[in-house]
From Swiss-Prot:
It catalyses: AMP + diphosphate = 5-phospho-alpha-D-ribose 1-diphosphate + adenine. InterPro entries: Ade_phspho_trans (IPR005764), PRibTrfase_dom (IPR000836), PRTase-like (IPR029057), UPRTase/APRTase (IPR050054). GO terms for biological process: adenine salvage; AMP salvage; purine ribonucleoside salvage. Homodimer. This is Adenine phosphoribosyltransferase. Its EC number is 2.4.2.7.
Length: 182
């Protein structure tokens, strides 16, 4: 044993909290934005995040879906790591072929997400990944898109969950893996 003892390995939660940037008053005054891009920019942290998100769902999905935009980063890495396909859930008007559309409420107004109708065959299983779970509206809309396609949702994985916004309630009945709950 040398003079320098090996440091204990940092947990995934500790890595995320260390790397996540907190931006006050963004995108508007009174809002505290949690920027996960420094987590994704760190290769070891990104690998640890992806591994931690998919591990509870091992063998339970045929493809990984990412919600625009940061969900794409997670889904592509997870699909590659697990040898499955990646599916993109996009904002309305961004996909070129026939789509399913799901409208959902935002704090101020509404939005819509779309999924290509032929991305996955009916009966397939999909793991849905996104960066943050807040109110659950975006992920619930994503789940409805896959239901329209006859695709089963294996579960949800998110890096950061804002627990005070009760997003889990909108996703009742599905397994949710969140790496950090604030």
């Amino acid at each position: 044993m040398g003079i320098h003892a090996e440091q204990p390995k940092e947990s995934i939660e500790e890595q995320i909290q260390r790397l996540c940037a907190t931006v006050p008053d963004y995108p508007e005054p009174g809002i505290t934005f949690r920027d996960l891009t420094p987590v994704f920019a760190d290769g070891a942290a990104l690998r640890a995040v992806v591994d931690a998100l998919v591990e509870p769902f091992a063998g339970q999905f045929d493809a990984v879906a990412g919600v625009e935009a940061r969900g794409f980063l997670l889904a592509a890495a997870a699909a590659y790591a697990t040898g499955t396909g990646v599916i993109t859930v996009r904002k309305a008007g961004k996909l070129p072929r026939a789509v399913y559309t799901e409208h959902y409420s935002l704090e101020y107004g509404t939005a819509a997400l779309e999924l290509h109708r032929d991305d996955l065959p009916a009966g397939s299983r999909v793991l849905i990944l996104d960066d943050v779970l807040a109110t659950g509206g975006t992920l619930a809309a994503t789940s409805k898109l896959f239901a329209k396609a006859g695709v089963n949702v294996a579960g949800y994985g998110v890096v950061l969950e804002l627990a005070e916004l009760h997003g889990r309630e909108a996703l009742a009945g599905h397994q949710i893996r969140s790496l950090v709950r604030l």
